């Protein structure tokens, strides 16, 4: 009942109100020219007016409530990702105190983390990371030797939008008389091998020319990012932690190598010839995958429209794609990244470092101002946990954007097991970038790849850890 829900509601351990004299709390957030009109742009910090759009209006009302309660003004400045790192450096080194909260893009942020530009969020007054409005997976993944320079929070839907998932075309699945895909997920049977089987069954060379073209129906529409997504779907990560809360490069166990080799078979299906009936299974693996990063003039929009126009059974995506796809005609469902094997405990969904940023607080904030910003962030996060996040998941993703109740259940699975791998964030020794090229290059010799990178990766982890420890001491 509603009363029980109210009783169970966790409240922030901060005063319910304060008077900061209409002081401005200014957020600096990365942007990307060309992305301004898409959902990849941050839409969760401020809203100018009530428009009738669910996320916008929830953000507007959230801010109004917190601004009234604490007598502050929440403001936003967007800056292109090509400029924001320099601006943050100048801000901190110049001690100008312009910005109170910063969101550089996650892919570009590690160099800033190592320069002592940001407070350890664990030490900011009034912020309680044990509360559910701070993402515990992000806290665990990003903290190194106790230092947490950035965090994912309920204030934002942007990092949820950056979560990997898979869409499937229901019409193609029905025409190919495939088994019920939702049931596979619910029964824990949605695996790499099952993806391969279904994709092979759905692939059609419509024009009969024997070659893969966008005129045909692919089993899986993807890009180079798929290799990262599939690997992390296995529940494994490149980087884990030791007893001192330090990063350790643990990628390369026998099971992990097997996982990657399977991923390669999937990613590389476009790049091989099919010559003989005796290689039917291999042929199917080779034929049904499209890597849009290796085909000329295929940007993200073109790639998405291929799926919307019925040219693929499966479509690798981030959740931000769902908002764009709802305008199309395709009857699609949403499912998590497949498991490596049925016995795996859960489905895991990677968060893309390329399309999100996480919250940091610059070390230029001190004393009363730091305490004020901590309180406002805690209040915003708590309020968002009960308003913005439910609105995002229940209304925007489930009701507005998904076409059926079953996709709604899948979204809970996707959101509840999100993976932040430190390797994807820090890219130690360029490993993450090189790994993403393995699929394109059809390199299945994973052991040699690891061996060639191990020394440099270990060296860069050590260097990064020392820099983060020094940054924590300074911050």
Please report, for each region that a protein language model flagged, where it lies by residue.
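Gram-positive cell-envelope targeting signals
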Residues: 1-13, 27, 66, 98-104, ...
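Short, well-ordered beta-strand elements
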Residues: 21-56, 72-77, 101, 218-220, ...
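Short, solvent-exposed loop/beta-turn-alpha elements that line the ligand-binding surface or hinge
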Residues: 126-134, 185, 237-258, 342-349
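Conserved C-terminal helix/tail region of periplasmic/extracytoplasmic solute-binding proteins
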Residues: 363-374, 381-475
């Amino acid at each position: 009942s509603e009363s029980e829900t109210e009783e169970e509601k966790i409240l922030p351990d901060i005063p319910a109100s304060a008077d900061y004299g209409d002081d401005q709390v200014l957020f600096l957030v990365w942007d990307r020219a060309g992305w301004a009109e898409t959902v990849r742009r941050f839409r969760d910090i401020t809203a100018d007016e009530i428009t009738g759009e669910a996320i916008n209006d929830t953000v507007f009302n959230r801010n109004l409530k917190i601004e009234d309660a604490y007598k502050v003004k929440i403001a936003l400045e967007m800056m292109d990702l090509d400029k924001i790192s320099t601006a943050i450096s100048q801000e901190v080194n110049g001690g100008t105190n312009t910005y109170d909260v910063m969101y550089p893009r996650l892919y570009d942020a590690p160099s800033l983390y190592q320069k002592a530009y940001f407070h350890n969020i664990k030490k900011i007054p009034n912020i309680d990371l044990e509360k559910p409005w701070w993402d515990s997976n992000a806290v665990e993944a990003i903290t190194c030797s106790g230092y947490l320079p950035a965090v994912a929070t309920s204030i934002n839907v942007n990092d949820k939008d950056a979560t990997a998932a898979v869409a499937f075309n229901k019409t193609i699945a029905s025409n190919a008389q495939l088994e019920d895909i939702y049931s596979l997920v619910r029964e824990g049977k949605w695996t790499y091998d099952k993806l391969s089987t279904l994709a092979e069954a759905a692939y059609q060379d419509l024009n009969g020319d024997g070659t893969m073209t966008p005129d045909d129906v692919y089993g899986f529409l993807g890009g180079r990012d798929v290799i990262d997504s599939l690997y992390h779907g296995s529940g494994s990560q490149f980087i884990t932690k030791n007893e001192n809360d330090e990063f350790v490069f643990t990628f390369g166990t026998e099971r992990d190598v097997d996982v990657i080799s399977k991923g390669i078979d999937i990613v590389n299906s476009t790049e091989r010839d099919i010559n003989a009936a005796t290689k039917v299974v291999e042929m199917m693996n080779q034929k049904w995958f499209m890597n849009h990063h290796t085909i000329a003039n295929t940007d993200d929009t073109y790639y998405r429209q291929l799926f919307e126009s019925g040219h693929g059974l499966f479509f690798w995506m981030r959740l931000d794609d769902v908002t764009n796809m709802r305008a199309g005609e395709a009857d699609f469902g949403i499912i998590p990244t497949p498991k490596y094997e049925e016995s795996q405990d859960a489905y895991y969904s990677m968060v893309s470092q390329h399309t999100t940023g996480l919250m940091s607080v610059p070390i230029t904030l001190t004393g009363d101002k730091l305490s004020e910003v901590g309180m406002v962030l805690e209040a915003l996060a708590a309020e968002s946990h009960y308003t913005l996040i439910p609105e995002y998941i229940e209304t925007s993703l489930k009701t507005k954007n998904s076409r059926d109740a079953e996709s709604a259940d899948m979204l809970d699975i996707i959101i509840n097991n999100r993976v932040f791998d430190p390797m994807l964030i820090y890219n130690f020794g360029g490993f993450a970038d090189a790994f993403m090229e393995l699929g394109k290059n059809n390199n299945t010799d994973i052991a040699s790849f690891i061996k060639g990178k191990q020394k440099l990766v270990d060296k860069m982890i050590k260097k990064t850890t020392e820099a983060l420890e020094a940054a924590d001491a300074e911050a």
